[in-house]
Swiss-Prot record:
SUPFAM superfamilies: EF-hand. It comes from Gallus gallus (Chicken). GO terms for molecular function: calcium ion binding. Ca(2+) binds at residues 36, 38, 40, 47. GO terms for cellular component: cytoplasm; mitochondrion; myosin complex. Pfam families: EF-hand_6. The keyword Transferase does not apply. The keyword Metal-binding applies. The N-terminus is blocked. N,N,N-trimethylalanine, found in other myosin light chains would not have been detected in the N-terminal tryptic peptide in PubMed:7319048 because it would remain trimethylated and ninhydrin negative after hydrolysis. This is Myosin regulatory light chain 2B, cardiac muscle isoform. Myosin is a hexamer of 2 heavy chains and 4 light chains.
Length: 165
């Protein structure tokens, strides 16, 4: 029997599996499996409706489900699912870039900024945040008892999707 040839890594990132680490792919696979309620290998409107119901959100509008499914170029199998996440994440700035933006407001390098100050900056500068966006940010990343926002953790979560252990 002839020796097996090693698979070449696809250059230029066109292979969606090369965009993620193996552990990330496994996590996406687990999420896909949970969402594929009828276990047919595809996520469709019925699967999405069942997933929302399992999360306690009932009465999801059919139009909303259709819009979600339409985001895919075709039937949503695991590869399409992974590709969709890859495309969404591709535009995310690297963690260091986001950290550097926050460091402008933290010349002493403490790793935190007064929440009131960052709120003022985000609501008054170019690309203004709405009050609702500020509320969402502080709901997800509440300031500490001293009123400081831990921007290092915020940056980590923005770029990695989960808090550091």
């Amino acid at each position: 029997m002839a020796p097996k040839k090693a698979k070449k890594k696809v250059e230029g990132g066109s292979n969606v599996f090369s965009m993620f680490e193996q552990t990330q792919i496994q996590e996406f696979k687990e999420a896909f499996t949970i969402m594929d309620q009828n276990r047919d290998g595809f996520i469709d409107k019925a699967d999405l409706r069942d997933t929302f119901a399992a999360l306690g959100r009932l009465n999801v509008k059919n139009e909303e489900l259709e819009d979600m499914v339409k985001e895919a170029p075709g039937p949503i199998n695991f590869t399409v699912f992974l590709t969709m996440f890859g495309e969404k994440l591709k535009g995310t700035d690297p963690e260091e870039t986001i950290l550097n933006a926050f460091k402008i407001f933290d010349p002493e390098g403490k790793g935190h900024i007064k929440a009131d100050y960052i709120k003022e900056m985000l609501m008054t500068q170019e690309g203004r945040f709405s009050q609702e966006e500020i509320n969402q940010m502080f709901a997800a990343f509440p300031p500490d008892v001293s009123g400081n926002l831990d921007y290092k953790n915020l940056c980590y979560v923005i770029t990695h999707g989960e808090e550091k252990d």
